Design a protein with these regions (language model features):
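Intrinsically disordered, low-complexity terminal regions
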Residues: 1-210
């Protein structure tokens, strides 16, 4: 079953349900939500915009197990995205943001087709996964746990990569790379940056990849 809902504009997404969300940036289109799910799931959903945040969650005391839950949405801009649990967020097409911040709590997934911004800050706590394509001047990647950040196709000038645990980061850096690993995490990088600073405590590894 499908429902399309008109909503206010927003620049942040908070995903707290096991949904697959497809976001597009349209500066000249009215924001909307289009929800595809089982008919009995709609009444348990609480989808709203508050304080420029699109919040996607369930109503109090609701526990959903949909056979499918797919959400399509757009806004004029996006600056922040948070995924809690096992949700998936895809930024479709080209997305331009001044500064972009993303966070995954749990086993969720974020994928960006073409994200262009000045700075990007990404943090994963748990076993989540983030895959990035695009470019930025500066990136800050952090993992606590066993998560992964795949950014071999995300070009940055300067990057700060930190892992606590067994996570994995792949980065494409041209100028400066600062790495801090505590545990058995791995950082692989491309781009031949002339300045690479490493601090490793444990069995972590740093590898330059051609």
């Amino acid at each position: 079953m499908n429902r399309r809902i008109a909503i206010d504009n927003y620049d942040q997404i908070i995903l707290n349900i096991p949904a697959e969300v497809f976001y597009q940036q349209f500066s000249d289109s009215a924001p909307y939500l289009q929800i595809h799910t089982d008919e009995n799931i709609f009444d348990a959903l609480n989808a709203r915009v508050e304080n420029n945040q699109l919040i996607l969650e369930t109503k109090e005391n609701s526990n959903i197990r949909p056979s499918k839950l797919t959400i399509y949405t757009c806004s004029h801009n996006i600056s922040q995205a948070t995924v809690s649990g096992s949700g998936k967020l895809r930024l479709k097409g080209e997305v331009n943001a001044g500064d972009f911040k993303s966070e995954i709590l749990g086993s969720g997934d974020i994928q960006a087709d073409s994200l262009i911004c000045n700075t990007i800050t990404t943090k994963i706590t748990g076993s989540g996964n983030e895959q990035l394509v695009g470019a930025s001047n500066h990136s800050s990647f952090a993992i606590v746990g066993s998560g992964s950040i795949h950014a071999f196709n995300y070009l940055v000038r300067e990057s700060n990569c930190k892992i606590i645990g067994s996570g994995n980061i792949e980065a494409l850096v041209t100028d400066r790379l600062d790495i801090n690993v505590i545990g058995s995490g791995n950082v692989s990088y491309r781009g031949n940056p002339p300045a690479v600073n490493k601090e490793i405590a444990g069995a972590g590894k740093v590898q330059a990849v051609q």
